[in-house]
């Protein structure tokens, strides 16, 4: 199975039923004969722009339409508690359980100054491409979550 076929199946599963987590999505993929690792699924979700959104009474994985980016931007802004940088990394503190969604939002910009993000429960580490770009990445993130 090619990457494109796998990602198409992921889109179908997410749009066709309520899937609340990557773990649940991994189980759904396995039930239709697609065996992949959690790391591969995580990369696929980031590439597809999949985010975990609250929908009334529970969370669900979703692929937002391009017009929904501003709605997500506003939600992300509420979830971020602080943004700090040292010489090497940008660290974002979030509400508990929201770091993954914030990291996915940052990844969705596909900014060439950012190699990637690493999310825990309430902390996101943003890794700039070079140390010289850390301040620019810090400012980019601030601008990405603010209307100012």
Swiss-Prot record:
Record protein name field: Arginine repressor
Coiled-coil parts of chain: none
InterPro entries, A to Z: Arg_repress, Arg_repress_C, Arg_repress_C_sf, Arg_repress_DNA-bd, WH-like_DNA-bd_sf, WH_DNA-bd_sf
SUPFAM superfamilies: C-terminal domain of arginine repressor, Winged helix' DNA-binding domain
UniProt gene name: argR
Chain's role: Regulates arginine biosynthesis genes.
Pathway(s) served: Amino-acid biosynthesis; L-arginine biosynthesis [regulation]
One of the record's GO cellular component terms: cytoplasm
MF GO annotations: arginine binding; DNA binding; DNA-binding transcription factor activity
Keywords: Amino-acid biosynthesis, Arginine biosynthesis, Cytoplasm, DNA-binding, Repressor, Transcription, Transcription regulation
Subcellular location: Cytoplasm
Biological process terms in GO annotation: L-arginine biosynthetic process; protein complex oligomerization; regulation of arginine biosynthetic process
Amino-acid biosynthesis recorded as keyword: yes
Pfam families cross-referenced by the UniProt entry: Arg_repressor (PF01316), Arg_repressor_C (PF02863)
């Amino acid at each position: 199975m090619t990457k494109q076929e796998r990602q198409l199946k992921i889109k179908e599963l997410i749009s066709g039923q309520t899937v609340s987590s990557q773990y649940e999505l991994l189980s759904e993929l396995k039930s239709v004969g697609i065996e992949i690792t959690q790391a591969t699924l995580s990369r696929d979700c980031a590439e597809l722009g999949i985010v975990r959104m609250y929908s009334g009474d529970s969370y669900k994985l979703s692929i937002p339409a391009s017009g929904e980016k501003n709605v997500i931007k506003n939600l992300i802004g509420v979830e971020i508690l602080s943004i700090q940088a040292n010489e090497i990394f940008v660290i974002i503190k979030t509400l508990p359980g929201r770091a993954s969604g914030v990291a996915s939002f940052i990844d969705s910009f596909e900014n060439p100054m950012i190699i990637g993000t690493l999310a825990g429960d309430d902390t996101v580490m943003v890794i700039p491409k070079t140390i010289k770009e850390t301040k620019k990445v810090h400012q980019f993130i601030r601008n990405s979550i603010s209307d100012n």
